[in-house]
């Protein structure tokens, strides 16, 4: 515990960030170790994971500390803005967290694919390993469908009518629009711990437009509607899980409150049905909190004998997904090496020499 960092600390409590990361208890580090030592894991993937853990991955933020002539700002974002004729002012830092988030437009597709890969594995495992007595219907596997479409195509409309839910949600959204605009305007892309694929989507987008929960589940026995969300987020800091859970709670606040209000209006004080948000959080470098993960699986009535195997699979998926995102970064960076270089041939030669870090 002595090495644990405080929430607002800008440096580790003792020794190094790597020591703090590796010594965190209850974060599935045994599976990180087995993945790193496995012969099935490519040596390049092991090297890149080690660089992330030791804070020595050769992104521009790290390179700038060694070679000040290299700008710490994201080159991929600069190229994207230049191609669109947009201003190149206030470019975000090219940190590991940034290039693994949808905040980097060039990496957005790769990041979304990484999120979907991990969630599809986890959802399939939950569906396949339920208790014999479980009566749980999962809806929302097709991410292309909006919430209204899912409502019309599933049995959930037997419990909650979409028009009634929409009316209540509209009222809640109207009340929250002002505070939501303030929250969005205060977002700082330079804060590494704020980088995430959701970027705090507005309530309206979550409920009525393209953004929606990763999945939903109806428990017919216990009369609960579960809103299921998966967050793949940077786990450099020890508070990664609480921050991701807070973002998920904010993101789905209107939906959960709307469902609860519909139930209260329909059933009065003796509420028969309830709604609950379950947020699974996976760190980009394989962090999965054991207690919280098991708690969620128990809530979804997964066979206890499968908890460890499912968690191991998720850790491996997270690590493989991270490597694919990092390889995407290298492919885009190196594919344009030398193009539009603002600092001349010297910088190109330097970047070429630094390729050994990859």
Give, region by region, the residue ranges found by the protein language model.
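Helix/loop segments that flank and initiate small ligand/metal-binding modules
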Residues: 1-93
């Amino acid at each position: 515990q002595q090495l644990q960092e405080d929430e607002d600390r800008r440096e580790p409590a003792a020794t190094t960030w790597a020591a703090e990361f590796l010594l965190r208890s209850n974060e599935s580090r045994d599976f990180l170790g087995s993945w790193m030592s496995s012969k099935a894991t490519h040596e390049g993937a092991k090297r890149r994971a080690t660089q992330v853990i030791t804070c020595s991955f050769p992104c521009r933020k790290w390179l700038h500390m060694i070679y000040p002539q290299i700008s710490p700002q994201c080159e991929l974002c600069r190229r994207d803005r230049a191609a669109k004729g947009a201003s190149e002012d206030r470019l975000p830092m090219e940190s590991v967290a940034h290039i693994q988030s949808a905040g980097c437009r060039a990496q957005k597709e790769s990041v979304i694919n990484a999120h979907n890969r991990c969630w599809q594995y986890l959802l399939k495992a939950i569906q396949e390993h339920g208790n014999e007595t479980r009566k749980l219907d999962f809806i929302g596997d097709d991410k292309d469908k909006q919430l209204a479409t899912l409502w019309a195509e599933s049995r959930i409309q037997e419990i909650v009518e979409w028009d009634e839910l929409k009316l209540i949600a509209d009222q809640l959204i109207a009340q929250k629009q002002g505070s939501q605009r303030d929250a969005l305007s205060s977002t700082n892309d330079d804060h590494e711990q704020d980088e995430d694929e959701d970027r705090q989507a507005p309530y309206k987008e979550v409920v009525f437009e393209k953004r929606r929960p990763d999945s939903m589940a109806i428990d017919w026995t216990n009369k609960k509607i579960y809103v299921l969300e998966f967050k793949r987020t940077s786990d450099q800091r020890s508070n990664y899980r609480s921050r991701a859970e807070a973002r998920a709670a904010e993101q789905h606040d209107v939906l959960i409150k709307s469902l609860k209000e519909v139930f209260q209006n329909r059933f009065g004080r003796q509420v028969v049905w309830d709604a609950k948000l379950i947020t699974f959080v996976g760190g980009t470098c394989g962090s999965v909190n054991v207690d919280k993960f098991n708690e969620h699986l128990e809530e979804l009535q997964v066979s206890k004998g499968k908890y460890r195997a499912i968690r191991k699979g998720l850790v491996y998926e997270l690590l493989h997904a991270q490597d694919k995102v990092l390889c995407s970064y290298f492919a885009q960076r190196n594919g344009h090496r030398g193009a539009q270089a603002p600092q001349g041939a010297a910088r190109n030669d330097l970047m070429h020499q630094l390729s050994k870090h990859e």
